[in-house]
Regions:
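N-terminal Rossmann-like or analogous alpha/beta NTP/dinucleotide-binding catalytic cores
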Residues: 1-73, 168-169
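Alpha-helical recognition segments enriched in aromatics with Gly/Pro capping
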Residues: 68-71, 78-212
Length: 212
């Protein structure tokens, strides 16, 4: 909806729920997942990434990412296109001014203070601690960080993510962790033989999936 355009680039747990039932779109999505799990009597512990970032559960792992910043960049950069390499950083600052997740170049890292420095659109330099929900990670280092912080033993993923999982495993080792056992599966295709992809919007809802 057009009314959500101003929420672009906010964390999903800050985006308004378009259905008006929950505090955020993230809470809406989490509720749908938990409803599915509960209907089938799954025994699970629900982990909120937003809560773990804000409550400091990920802090030690984030500091390790910062301490090994250069080595991690050496692993990630060869997998990126030239244009992307120019501004890439594992850390995405969350602007204290707008609350938006920023994909900007990092001007400076301070391993002693545990901070990163970036420029706002106004040109103002902002120094942020990487702790307590001030930043989030790009998805590949985030994957590795969660394995480390949550002591994940086993991870499944589609075969299109094999290179990303292998890269995340390298990052996990760099920060002192042991990657989980990895298992990849074949891709699910739609009626046109195209890969089902949430980024393309041709996926199935949980309701449709259960119906089939």
């Amino acid at each position: 909806p057009e009314k959500l355009e101003e929420d672009l680039d906010l964390p999903l747990t800050k985006v308004r729920d378009p259905f008006g039932k929950f505090n955020s779109f993230g809470d809406h999505n989490n509720a749908k997942l938990k409803e599915f799990l509960d209907n089938y009597n799954f025994n699970y512990n629900f982990e909120s990434a937003t809560k773990n970032y804000k409550d400091g559960i990920f802090d030690d792992a984030l500091i390790k990412i910062l301490e090994n910043y250069d080595e991690i960049m050496e692993v990630i950069l060869p997998s990126l296109r030239e244009e992307r390499k120019k501004t890439y950083s594992p850390f995405l600052p969350i602007s204290p001014i707008t609350g938006k997740v920023l994909q900007v170049a990092i001007e400076e890292i301070n391993k002693t203070k545990g901070t990163i420095t970036y420029k706002e659109q106004s040109g103002e330099k902002i120094e942020l601690s990487v702790k307590s929900g001030n930043v989030k990670l790009q998805w590949k280092p985030d994957w590795a960080m969660r394995w480390f912080a949550l002591d994940v033993d086993y991870e499944m993923f589609g075969k299109d993510l094999i290179p990303s999982a292998e890269l995340a495993a390298k990052i996990c080792r760099i920060i002192g962790g042991n990657p989980p056992e990895l298992l990849n599966y074949e891709l699910f295709l739609d009626e046109n033989g195209q890969k089902i992809s949430k980024s393309k919007g041709n996926g199935l809802s949980i309701e449709d999936w259960l119906r089939y």
